[in-house]
Amino acid sequence: MDLDVTSLHHRRAVHRWERMSVGDLIERVTWSRPDKVAIVGRPGAYADEQMRALTYRQADQVANQVAHALLASGLERGDVVLLFCENSVEAYLAKIGIAKAGLVAAPLNPMMAPDLVAAMIDLAGPKLAIVD
């Protein structure tokens, strides 16, 4: 089954929550609770100590930076971005940034067998990859 994600933009959903992305939800909470802690990473779930605990404002800023960088690279709405990363705070924020940019995240576990990784990359057809 093919799904044209570009045609979903501006499409009206029946319920208000169906029209929101994760990025939209984080922005809304950021407006009302900017300094509340949003994300806490367990030891080993973040590469940079500054990512250990983030407020909604900080998480939204990082996700926006990712979104702007991806769009500045020439990607367009609906393009696939491969995430070849371990589970981490940074990878989670990258997924949110990808969604905010109107792109499609294709997460791929780096612990998978190389032949399966190659097959999944071929299937996803990413325009760009984020690798940790």
Describe the predicted segments one by one.
Residues 27-28, 118:
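Active-site phosphate/pyrophosphate- and oxyanion-stabilizing loops and adjacent acidic/basic residues
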Residues 99:
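Anion (oxyanion) recognition and catalysis
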Residues 18, 35-96, 113-118, 122:
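Conserved AMP-binding/adenylate-forming core of the ANL superfamily
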Residues 28-35:
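Flexible acidic/glycine-rich loop/turn elements at helix↔coil and beta-strand↔loop transitions
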Residues 14-18, 58, 106-108:
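Short, flexible loop segments at the rims of nucleotide/cofactor-binding pockets, characterized by
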Residues 102:
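Structured binding elements
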Residues 1-23, 42:
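Flexible, non-catalytic linker and terminal segments flanking ANL/adenylate-forming cores
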Residues 106, 110-132:
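Conserved ATP-dependent adenylate/AMP-binding module captured primarily in the ANL superfamily
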